[in-house]
Curated annotation (Swiss-Prot):
The keyword Nucleotide-binding applies. Homodimer. GO terms for molecular function: aspartate-tRNA ligase activity; ATP binding; catalytic activity, acting on a protein; nucleic acid binding; transferase activity. This is Aspartate--tRNA ligase. Keywords: Aminoacyl-tRNA synthetase, ATP-binding, Cytoplasm, Ligase, Nucleotide-binding, Protein biosynthesis. It is an enzyme of class 6 (ligase). L-aspartate binds at residues 177, 223, 451, 492. Its main location: cytoplasm. ATP binds at residues 223-225, 232, 485, 537-540. It catalyses: tRNA(Asp) + L-aspartate + ATP = L-aspartyl-tRNA(Asp) + AMP + diphosphate. Its EC number is 6.1.1.12. The keyword Chloroplast does not apply.
Length: 588
């Protein structure tokens, strides 16, 4: 077997008239009777190779036996293609390789789906079962090349700015906050369990107390939660922590790193500083704490109509401390039928809204089911509050503020997608700041941390923990990209007494706090520096940089929506002996 001289996807005009040795997979084969053309593929791309009896009758006879996905080695000379056969869609499209010798390294059975097509109609379960074949597709190969470029850019930036790459434990202690833990039973300590980390949060804080000053890690994290298109049970996090910093320092670092990533991976210069928006403003204007700012259609408060109109739904809502908000789909009045509006009503029902009121703005006023409730003065108020014009579709939700925000925020995205308002080539970064420190859990009847229990309140709000904890703001910041939460960070609590107070507000007894987090409270006794950081979802970042819509396309061997691996059939049963060693028994 000869040594490969270059990759298939790197054979360009620079190699004209040179001999090359290539190895790869048969992507496509065309027999034109006397001449055989093969597209040979490897991770760098595809090159056309030609079997011509004038060059080698022996090679031609072997080529007659090869089929799709055979692994072959070829030797040949790079020549220029005829002008009428140039393929401008690929970087090797100006040349071809005249083959003088071919060896079949390994044969292939007929794959369960075609590798040389987009496979949009192939059942995803089939793709995941044969993931090693799915990953051969040039489209996915390019995605993982960009993933590598992304991690390389991140490491380069952090390495060049004084960060240490330090690993933290994978087997750790289960803590009650956040999502469910994946538990690992201990054989040595009967009846006791490790947990796989949801985040290296506490360890990175301990590393700051240890004096390492700047830490990072590209790390696997695990959460046993219900899945959706942008969630996986195991995911990769870019974890960063810094000592002696404030919020501005972390934000500046995050922006510099992300600008380098986008420049290195996509060749795009992202201007800075990134826009910022408070949590309150994001919820008020977009109905989301991760707003997609690539298009307008902001939520407009029209509660004034509830005080002026004789429309019971609006009126009762406002009188009961609710609110009425609207979104305006510009020029979309003719795009939606009554049946379409019924479907949109069902959509907002998912988010708790009792209904969706709507009107279409026409030249002489309004049309639609509730148009009759609008006096001329009400129409004027509506237009003044929303800037609605003739041809626009106006949709209203009247309910409790959180229901209004969630339902209209989701509807805003749905309408924008249906009307094609989103520029998929845009990268709109946004910082969301000034988060509430706490959220009230109606089921548990207690406060829970909006981010996590180690987030510091703003200095001026520390006193509120005793009297009005619901009004305390966090020293927290999220980075949003195109409507997705890319990452979140905060300045951490670095004082033992304040951390104990935070646990108390969250409903922990002193004994519970000591039992679960005693090691952290002890560490605070030995001189903790002020510190803060951020964690970015690498899988999600790659998904957005590659214009993917499914997180699974950015993970080499992902799980399904039900957290199974169709390739390996994980999770699976284990033997009685294994269970016995762990002192476990399965109860059906």
């Amino acid at each position: 077997m000869s040594k490969r001289t270059t990759y298939c996807g790197l054979v360009t005009e620079e190699l004209l008239n040179q001999k090359v040795t290539l190895k790869g997979w048969v992507h496509n084969r065309r027999d034109l009777g006397g001449l055989i053309f093969v597209d040979l593929r490897d991770r760098e791309g595809i090159v056309q190779i030609v079997f011509n009896p004038d060059f080698s009758e022996e090679a031609l006879s072997v080529a007659e036996t090869v089929r799709s996905e055979y692994v072959v080695e070829v030797e040949g000379t790079v020549t220029k293609r005829d002008p009428d056969t140039v393929n401008s869609k690929i970087k090797t499209g100006q040349v071809e390789v005249q083959v003088s010798n071919i060896s079949i390294i390994n044969k292939s059975e007929t794959p369960p789906f075609s590798i040389n097509e987009e496979n949009q109609n192939v059942d995803e379960n089939i793709r995941l079962k044969y993931r090693y074949l799915d990953l051969r597709r040039p489209e996915l190969a390019q995605t993982f090349k960009m993933r590598h470029q992304t991690t390389r850019a991140i490491r380069e930036y952090l390495d060049n700015n004084g960060f240490f790459d330090i690993e933290t434990p994978v087997l750790t202690k289960s803590t009650p906050e956040g999502a469910r833990d994946y538990l690992v039973p201990s054989r040595v300590h009967e009846g006791e369990f490790y947990a796989l980390p949801q985040s290296p949060q506490l360890f990175k804080q301990l590393l700051m107390i240890s004096g390492f000053d700047k830490y990072y890690q590209i790390v696997k994290c695990f959460r046993d939660e219900d899945l959706r298109a942008d969630r996986q049970p195991e995911f990769t996090q870019v974890d960063i922590e810094m000592s002696f910093v404030d919020q501005e320092d972390v934000i500046q670092m995050g922006e510099e790193m992300l600008r380098k990533v986008v420049k290195d991976v996509k060749g795009i210069d992202v201007s800075g500083p990134f826009p910022r928006m408070t949590y309150e403003e994001a919820m008020r204007r977009y109905g989301s704490d991760k707003p997609d700012t690539r298009f307008e259609m902001e939520l407009k408060d029209v509660s004034q109509l509830g005080r002026e109109m004789d429309f019971k739904v609006f009126k009762d809502t406002v009188e009961n401390n609710g609110e009425v908000k609207a979104i305006v789909a510009k020029g979309a009045a003719d795009n939606y039928t009554r049946k379409d509006m019924d479907a949109l009503t069902e959509f907002v029902n998912i988010y708790g809204a009792k209904g969706l009121a709507w009107v279409k703005v026409v030249d002489d006023g309004l049309s639609g089911p509730i148009a009759r409730f609008f006096e001329d003065s009400n129409v004027a108020t509506l237009k003044d509050l929303t800037q609605a014009e003739s041809g626009d579709l106006v949709m209203f939700v009247a309910d409790k503020p959180n229901v209004v925000a969630q339902s209209l925020g989701a509807l805003r995205i749905k309408i924008a997608k249906e009307l094609g308002l989103i520029d998929e080539n845009k990268l709109n970064f946004l910082w969301v700041t000034d988060w509430p420190l706490l959220e009230y859990d109606e089921d548990a009847k207690r406060y829970v941390a909006a981010h996590h229990p180690f987030t510091s309140p703003k200095q001026e709000d520390i006193s509120k923990l005793d009297s009005e904890p619901q009004n305390a703001q966090a020293n927290a910041y999220d980075i949003v990209l195109n409507g997705y939460e890319l990452g979140g960070g905060s300045i951490r609590i670095a004082d033992g007494e304040l951390q104990e107070k935070m646990f108390e507000v969250l409903g922990f007894t002193k004994e519970q706090a000591r039992e679960q987090f005693g090691f952290l409270l002890d560490a605070f006794k030995y001189g903790a520096p002020p510190h803060g950081g951020i964690a970015l979802g690498l899988d999600r970042l790659v998904m957005l940089l590659t214009n993917r819509t499914n997180l699974r396309d950015t993970i080499a061997f992902p799980k399904t929506a039900s957290a199974t691996c169709l390739l390996t059939d994980a999770p699976g049963e284990v033997s009685d002996k294994q269970l016995e060693e762990l002192s476990l028994r399965i109860r059906h």
